[in-house]
Amino acid sequence: MNKQAYYALAAALAKHFNQPLDSVLRGESFALKAPEAALLGENIQQRSDFLKQINMIQVAHTKGQKLFGATEKGVTGRKQTGRNLANLDHTQNGFELAETDSGIIVPWALFDSFAIFKDRLVELYSEYFQNQVALDILQIGWNGQSVADNTTKADLSDVNKGWLKLLQEQRAANFMTESTKSSGKITIFGDNADYANLDDLAFDLKQGLDFRHQNRNDLVFLVGADLVSKETKLIQQKHGLTPTEKAALGSHNLMGSFGGMNAITPPNFPARAAAVTTLKNLSVYTEAESVRRSLRNDEDKKGLVTSYYRQEGYVVEDLGLMTAIDHTKVKLNGEV
């Protein structure tokens, strides 16, 4: 391992977080102050275009009321007897954070490759680690099912409960597990399917939102890659497109609009999932005072260990502003 580069990285980390260099070199973890924790969270958020569009917030406690939760009704009006006021909707669940520990070991050989860049070493190494954390945040956000004491699932589904799971538990009426036509499944595509196409599905999900949200112009249709691929193939087959025309269709934004909403396939979104909400209705909360960092050289494992510990959780701010389908119950045209 390039020791000079390692010392330079440790020195940069110590300086950035105002920590004693000898403590960092010993591999001791250290707590971040709230502004430092917020800056780290912002840096991670910048690694993903999708994360940039949702809320990533530092909070003071591990449990509490949602910061951007729903009101009981619209907030505007008038009263002859006093001021017009709307209350927070206390029927909606609050938030609860869980211990979250992100760690990665960078083999000495890989670190030496980073060291070649010298003046950009700290920047590139930080980007490498933060990119991994950002991808994991999205993986858990879409696929998280539980909070295990000791996590074992390769898909990270036992690290925390993500947005889809929270919607299922906290507003079951907005989480479709079967259609009215069939039992135990949701069929998509084809004349006899519950939904002939994605436009029908998107419109139906939109109609499931609380009435006051249905005509918002910031709604988005989140849709999995398998559903988009199937829709594309059906369009190509229906119109008998030539290879050149298919290529043109592929370059055209098929994801433009469904049900009158812009469509997005977020990173790590389940392939057969679909949901309607606004991006600002999705949040990741981190307890500011819980954040800890560490960097150490592990001789036994022949690599550098970087760790980022915090209390973290996911929040659907307004449950009435989100609907979704259970992707495990989806059957495509021709499947039994």
Curated annotation (Swiss-Prot):
**What subcellular locations does the record give?**
Virion
Q: Does the keyword Glycoprotein apply?
A: no
Q: Which Gene Ontology terms of cellular component type are present?
A: viral capsid
Keyword vocabulary terms for this entry:
Capsid protein, Virion
Query: Pfam families under this entry?
Result: Phage_cap_P2
Q: Which domain of life is it from?
A: Viruses
Q: Does the keyword Manganese apply?
A: no
- Read off the InterPro entries from this record: Phage_P2_GpN (IPR006441)
Similarity annotation: Belongs to the P2-like viruses major capsid protein family.
Question: Which purpose does this protein serve, as stated in its record?
Answer: Assembles to form an icosahedral capsid.
Name-wise, this protein is Major capsid protein
Origin organism is Haemophilus phage HP1 (strain HP1c1)
Organism lineage reads as: Viruses, Duplodnaviria, Heunggongvirae, Uroviricota, Caudoviricetes
